[in-house]
Amino acid sequence: MARKDIVEHEPSYLMHQMPYSETSQIVRIFSQNYGRVDLIAKGSKRPKSKFRSFLQPFLPLQLSWSGKSQLKTLRQAEIHGQYLARIQGKHLLSAYYLNELILSFLRMEDPYQHLFALYASALHGFSESNPIEPILRQFEILMLAEIGYAINFETEALSQKPIEADLDYVFIAEQGFVAKRNHNSSPFVVKGQVIQAINQGNFADQETLVCAKKILRWSIQYHLDGKELKSKKVFKAIERQDGSK
């Protein structure tokens, strides 16, 4: 979508905010039709600022802004739709993880409308305390596809033959799924039927969930090129703590 000098009532979510001056902040948002946008919220740190109560993560917002440069000026903010129930615990950490993915991978001012809709759906699922792992996997899969790094769950990487349910495969982040008979050095083997289940978005089986988590983790780490997400560090600490109980 082409840039516009003035945007009004754009459905958006706050991803991150940082100080800009004694009274103002830079807010990084994810919007429905303009993707990631950075805005200066003038006076937002003042106690009586009109923005103060609205600029919080995970609230459905309508924002208006203006400007020709990459850093726009926030003009108006209001709640769009109903408040979600408060997101807590691991669900809250998972929501911050999605924000980190968005900030790490999405290009500025490119629309990702399908991903925006899935993000909103994910927040609703977190607020209802729905199972976390299927929500994360669905978001990760779509995000990688939207930015051009789609994982091919349909065909074998070398032969381009369809994935077969009764064959075993290994996953190579830079290639995709390779038949085990062609790549015997990997300790992680994925059943063809599991790959097919992931492709269908069917995470009812525990083995599918575990394999999907490993596949998406390796793929995201590969494309992060050595960078580690802060939320992932916290996840690992929680997992170690849970394992010691």
Question: What does each model-identified segment do?
Answer:
Residues 1-26, 30-245:
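Non-catalytic alpha-helical scaffolds and adjoining flexible linkers that form interface surfaces
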